[in-house]
Amino acid sequence: MNKKYRLTYTLHTELGERTCVETFRYFETVLQVLKNLNNHCEIDNINIEVIE
């Protein structure tokens, strides 16, 4: 059984808010993406789900 992780977040830009949904195979990748986004953008409403 291979787990996948769905990351949902709200991205705030100069043009407004955008809800983003991405799917990853590894939880470490989810954490890396969140760290990178947080360093360069404003994000909130972060939700991580395990999907199969």
Question: Where are the regions a protein language model picked out?
Answer:
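Generic detector of bulky aromatic hydrophobic side chains
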Residues: 1, 32, 48-49
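Short aromatic-glycine-(Arg/Gly/Cys) micro-motifs in beta-strand/loop hairpins
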Residues: 1-18
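Non-catalytic surface loops within mature trypsin-like serine protease
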Residues: 11-13, 26, 52
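A short, exposed loop/beta-hairpin motif centered on an aromatic-Gly-Thr core
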Residues: 15-28
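Short, mixed-charge low-complexity intrinsically disordered segments
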Residues: 36-52
